[in-house]
Curated annotation (Swiss-Prot):
UniProt tissue specificity: Widely expressed. Tends to be up-regulated in seminomas compared to normal testis.
Name this protein carries in UniProt: Vesicle transport protein GOT1B
UniProt xrefs under Pfam families: Got1 (PF04178)
Gene it is expressed from: GOLT1B
Major subcellular location class: Golgi
Residues spanning the membrane: 10-30, 33-53, 69-89, 91-109
Function of the protein: May be involved in fusion of ER-derived transport vesicles with the Golgi complex.
Keywords tagged on the record: Acetylation, Golgi apparatus, Membrane, Protein transport, Transmembrane, Transmembrane helix, Transport
One GO biological process term: retrograde transport, endosome to Golgi
Subcellular location: Golgi apparatus membrane
Topology feature Cytoplasmic, residues: 1-9, 54-68, 110-138
Species, as recorded: Homo sapiens (Human)
Amino acid sequence: MISLTDTQKIGMGLTGFGVFFLFFGMILFFDKALLAIGNVLFVAGLAFVIGLERTFRFFFQKHKMKATGFFLGGVFVVLIGWPLIGMIFEIYGFFLLFRGFFPVVVGFIRRVPVLGSLLNLPGIRSFVDKVGESNNMV
C-alpha cells in the first residue's frame, strides 16, 4: 500500500469533498455556492496532494497554458456568478489538462470486475476506446 503523509491525506479529503460538491452542485441545477466551494476544495486538495511547486509546474507548463486558462477561467466565472458558462469552460479545460491520464484510468477501470464489464457494453465501448487511446496524449 502507498504511504501517504498527513498533508497528502488532507489533500485527498479536500479533493474528494471538492468532487462531491461539484457533482452535487451540478445535480442541483448548477448551484453557484456549491460549485464555488467544490472548485476551491478541488484545487486546494490537488495542491495538498502533490505539493504547491508541482501543482504550479503542472498547471503552468507551456503546452498546457490554453487548458489552464480555460480551467482557471471557468473557476473564476463560477466564482463571479455564472455557473453554467463557468462549468463549460472548466470541463473543457479539465479534459485538456488531464487527457494524458485518461488511458491509464481507462486501463485501470477495465480491470475492475463490475466497472470493466460496464465499459464493454456496445454503446459505451466505442466511446471508452476513443477516450482510452494513448496516441492523443500531450
